[in-house]
Every structure is written in C-alpha cells, then in structure tokens.
Amino acid sequence: MNQMVDMGHAVPAARGLREARAFAPASVANVAVGFDLLGYPLDGVGDTVTVRRIDAPVVRIAAIRGTTVALPLEAERNTAGAALMSLRAALALPFGFELEIDKGIALSSGMGGSAASCVAALVAANALLDTPVSTDQLYQHALDGEAVASGSRHGDNLGPLFLGGLVLCTLERLVPIAVPEAWHSLVVHPEAVLETRRAREALAGDYRLSEFVAQSTNLALVLAGCHAGDADLVRAGLRDVLVEPRRAPLITGFAQAKQAALAHAALGASISGAGPSVFAWFETRAAAAAAAPAVQAAFAGVGLDSQAWVTPINSPAARLLA
C-alpha cells in the first residue's frame, strides 16, 4: 500500500535506510491566469523514482523507463539528476545518489513530466538523509532541476507536487489556495508534442499594458472566487488574454476543444502548461466526466487521438511509496 507522507515537515530518515521510492503526479501549470505562478496536481498519473544512497560522492542515473524517446542519463542534463546535484552541493554530502526513473507522463505534453521526476527524486532522496531538509529547501533544489528542462527557474509545476491542491508559486515561497472540494478538473492530452522551449519562444514580442491589466484582473477574480467558493467569480476570470492567444495557434484542435468544454458548463478552459494538453474546471466531478467525450471528440475531429483525466483540483502531493 502507498504511504502518504506529510510534505510540510521534515520526517527523520529510518536509520540505515539505503533506498527509497517516491511518486509525483502530473500537474497543470499556469491555470490560464497565473503564468509561471499557479498550478495544481493531477491524481492518478505521474512518475516514480527510486533513489539509492551510494558511497561514491556523485549523482548518477542508472535507468529511465516508460518512454520511447531517449532522455539524458547525464545527471546534469536531467531534471531529477540536476535537483539531486543541487541538494548534494548545498549540504556538502559525503555520499551520492543513484536513480531509476519510471516515466508515466508523456513527454512535452504540458502535464509537468520533468517536474514530476524532479520532485519524486527529491522526496525519495530526502528520506535517505540523516537529517531531512524542509519542503522550502527541497523546493529551491527543485527549481534548480526544472531550469534544466525549461531554461529558467519557475515553480508552477513544482509547488503543487510538494503541497497538493492549487498553489501560488513564487521563487521564494509556496502559498496554498483554498478550492471547494467538489470542484474538479478535466485534462485532455492530444497525441501531439509541443516542446516547452518552442512554446516559450512563441511568447517573445511586445505586450500592451491593457493586456497586463486584464490578466491581473482575471487572476484576482479567480483567486477571490476560489477563496470564497464563488463559481461565478471564477467563471468571470478564468480566461487567458496574455499567453493563450500566442500559443493556441501551435495546438491543432485547441479552439474546438476549448469550445467543447465551455459548451458543457466549464468554469473556464485553457492550455495546460506549455501545451498541447487542455484543462477545464467544473463545479462537480459528474460535470467534468460528462464533458470529457466532447473535448476528446473535438481533437478526434482534427485527426488526433487523446487521453482524458478527471481529478479533484485538490489532488494530493508527491508521496513516498512503501
């Protein structure tokens, strides 16, 4: 049975423990209104990382499974490896780590695959330390790891994996955002690839002040709506006027998929992370499940197969596995 671990406090390592395994879920980042700031986990899909404490003072990756695409085994070029290198350096550890990564998240899907490997590795490694470090410290090392994948430090895929639920992620702190338990998320991943770096390149160029004002207004409406449990406020604000218009042309079928979600009573819908996955919020699980076939049909209409997940927005964080 999986063992849930409270990520808010350091848990002393079992004496003599040499191996630990952790699971970290996929995640939705940006959430339409919080570019590089907001994110939440997706229960039921994620990456598993096994970490062994070794005598050699190095970090090495022994295996990566679950993907047909070759991922770098060099620790410094892998998000999980780079995060553990950052941890080792900060603590001046006299020992090292060996990792095995089992991928459960499609690459370049907009579902936080690189972040999941990174956080799972840190959670497992933390259990092997004589004196485990705090979540805040782990988060800083995760930022170092995630920078390998995206080219910059941003925590919107990372923070939710440490705290669970909707999280506001600055570079200095993580702030949990209360969301009604009944609210659910639908995520649909079309079988297409959109590299994060390419998606970020689409954001280059000039922006108008009016766009920033509108986006700030939408962010405020969503946060206020979540805090108050007011679906109408969230519905008024859960739309992206800043990033989505620049990335949507890169995602075949996005406009049709978004419209299908909105036609089925979604509070809002937009791009998950860098895409091509699409997310939508609903007031109930039943509503989210009812919308899934329509959103998938929209992608099928442009020749794309897809997978769909319905999960609570308040999904759990990364956890150690027994």
Curated annotation (Swiss-Prot):
EC number: 2.7.1.39
Keyword annotations of the record: Amino-acid biosynthesis, ATP-binding, Cytoplasm, Kinase, Nucleotide-binding, Threonine biosynthesis, Transferase
Keyword Transmembrane helix: no
Catalytic reaction annotation: L-homoserine + ATP = O-phospho-L-homoserine + ADP + H(+)
GO terms of molecular function: ATP binding; homoserine kinase activity
Cellular component terms per the entry's GO annotation: cytoplasm
Compartments in which it is found: Cytoplasm
Keyword rRNA-binding attached: no
Binding site for ATP: 106-116
Pathway assigned in UniProt: Amino-acid biosynthesis; L-threonine biosynthesis; L-threonine from L-aspartate: step 4/5
Membrane-spanning parts: none
Main subcellular location of this protein, as a coarse class: cytoplasm
GO biological-process terms attached to the record: threonine biosynthetic process
HAMAP family linked: Homoser_kinase
Role description: Catalyzes the ATP-dependent phosphorylation of L-homoserine to L-homoserine phosphate.
Family of this protein: Belongs to the GHMP kinase family. Homoserine kinase subfamily.
Protein name, entry field: Homoserine kinase
The organism of origin for this protein: Xanthomonas campestris pv. campestris (strain B100)
Gene giving rise to this polypeptide: thrB
